[in-house]
Amino acid sequence: LSVKIMKKKTKRNRERSHIPFRLNFLFFIVFALFAALIIQLGRLQVLNGASYQAMVNSTDKKIVTGNVPRGMVLDAKGRVLVGNSAKSAITYTKNMNVLADKMYAEANQLTKYLTIDKLDTLTERDQIDYYLSNPKNLKKWNARLPKSKKVAADGSKIPDKTVYQSTIDLVEKSFTGLSDKQKQAAAIFKIMSGAYQLSTVYIKNDNVTDKEIAEISEHLTSLPGINVGTDWERSYPNGDSMRSIIGHVSTEEQGLPEDGINSLLAQGYSRNDRVGTSYLEKQYESILHGSKSQTQVEVGNNNQILSSKVLFKGQKGSNLNLTIDQAYQTKVEAALKKIYAKAVAAGATTYSDGAYAVAMNPKTGAILAMAGEQNDRTTKQASDDALGVINRTFVMGSAVKGATVMGGMMDGVISPSNNTLPDTPIYLPSTPVKKSVYPVGTFGSLSAQSALEVSSNIYMMQLALREGKAEYIPNKKINISPDIFTKMRGYFNQFGLGQKTGIDLPGEAKGIEGPTLTDAGLPAVGSALDLSYGNYDAYTLIQLAQYISTIANGGNRMKPYLVDSIQQTGTDGNLGKLESKTSPTVLNTINAPKSYFNVVKEGMYNVVNGTNAWGTAHTLKDIKPTFGAKTGTAQSFAREDPNDSTSKQVETVTSSLVGFAPYNDPQVAIAIVFPNLTSDEGHYNTLLAREMITDYYKLNNISK
């Protein structure tokens, strides 16, 4: 028994001896862990404390840009055609990572102090976005979404963006719209949410009242990001004259145009920047836009702005000084309107496209005036369309005959001393007789100068036949060189007809060339003859101005231009130093002796000053100093219904004129067209030419 008791005690003592060991081992582990923790804390505090503290206090520096006013556009005498008008504005600068619910609350608060006038762009989606930016509404509608719209079939979470769209789809089914007050807040919310981080947008920049400015100024501390500032808009001190040449600028809402957005973004533009969208405003965007201001913003790790520093206050856009004197431009516009009104009163504009005129310095290419009236045949209303001078094409008729005569001499089929040709009609098989406007047999033969004076179609066709090495037998098929179109158009091109002129405006048309072959694949002889006297290919009016300038100056095809110089804006906001000045550009020089040009000039002199009864512009001979000109009348066609391309074609006439003055020292070249008249009996081309020449003389003190 005693032995058993001793064994039990020994066993019990042995079991007790294991307990302190386990406890000690456990305490050791705990001690080791605490020691490791203390060592780690010490390492963090002593070795890396400074770096972690720096991370806590870290900031991020960002560059924020701001827009500046655009440059001005001035006429040749320094008159401001386009400027900028300052106006009060309420702005919003978006902070970093601003949540929708914060903007929702701020938009609601702002409606207490200002009224948004423009709500027509507020879509149903905009209203729903505002509605769901209220956390309570978002939570309520999220709860109504079926689980399948939140969790995918495989158990994964559907992206928040997709869930939000599903929520919108659900709301749309029963959405009845917002109250008027809520729409005000929704419009503000839309602007805020559309802003980029740290960018500034305009909450309201039209018709901001003094009361709105005062109330918002009082509550700026409770309206983070909101400020009272200024904005600018394009102003036109001298009215709408030349608006179609100057072009337009987008609004902040319109922002960058879709057709150039990638290029502009690459240049540093923001999507809501205002840019030139047409003509001079677009062509010279990089000049007029200026340099944005740059502000360095320091942002803390809590995404709050800590400080800001202006690095560059920005530079207003440079200014464009145009070649156009507004006084002359206004005269040309008024004359065009007056004379077109005469055509309307006479019933000659039933199918008319309008009327166009341009004046150019033949020695430099500087545009002196550019005007256009486009006629809406449906409403019978006319509108300003000066750009029709460069982007509308018309068959101009006999006005181009100077180039035909020059081509004949350059080709060697006539010469200054040997240029008399028979003036007999051309008879082709199954084709109406090809002749001039005067009766057959009026002239037995004509010189080049006389042919220009009386506007002989026959003479020009004779030149074409000779250039094409054709043997003409009346009523027989004519074999003509296959390259006749290439040859004739090549001569025309040298003067600018059928070629882009290179004017510093976007959207210039090249012209339209008619077919050169018949259905049988042979040279279209009849069409080649029509081309010779200007009744086939279509040209722009600026091409006619370049062509007559080339005649006037003796062979230099000058590049037309509207911007004479670019001038900086001074620190006081006025004009600063000259940045650049346009130098006249010769695109090509006609390789022909002076005697060739003299032949054509003499013919154009006779058009105005000759004695032949069939002269086409003798009514202008009283203008002194005298000038040279060439009229044109083309057979043209218009659709009876302008809105139906399948409607009946109606025969019309297109009346044109080119000229240069004074004759002995050309300072101005003009081109005029009245397309698709029912009759040219009113001589509208010469009436307008009279006013354009005499007004130029008066304004520039040119006398006999």
Predicted regions and their residues:
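Active-site His/Glu-centered metal-binding helix of metallohydrolases
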Residues: 42, 399, 403
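Short, basic/aromatic recognition patches
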Residues: 53-65, 328-350
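Solvent-exposed, polar/charged alpha-helical surfaces in well-ordered, non-transmembrane soluble domains
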Residues: 101-108, 112, 214, 218, ...
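Beta-lactam-recognizing serine transpeptidase/beta-lactamase-like catalytic domain environment
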Residues: 82-83, 88, 298-313, 324, ...
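Short, gly/Ser/Thr-rich active-site loops of penicillin-recognizing serine hydrolases
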Residues: 578-579, 585, 687-704
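Membrane-proximal periplasmic segments of bacterial cell-envelope enzymes
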Residues: 2-286, 292, 297-305, 312, ...
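Short N-terminal helix-loop-first-beta-strand/juxtamembrane motif that initiates sensory/input modules
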Residues: 70-74, 223-227, 345-360
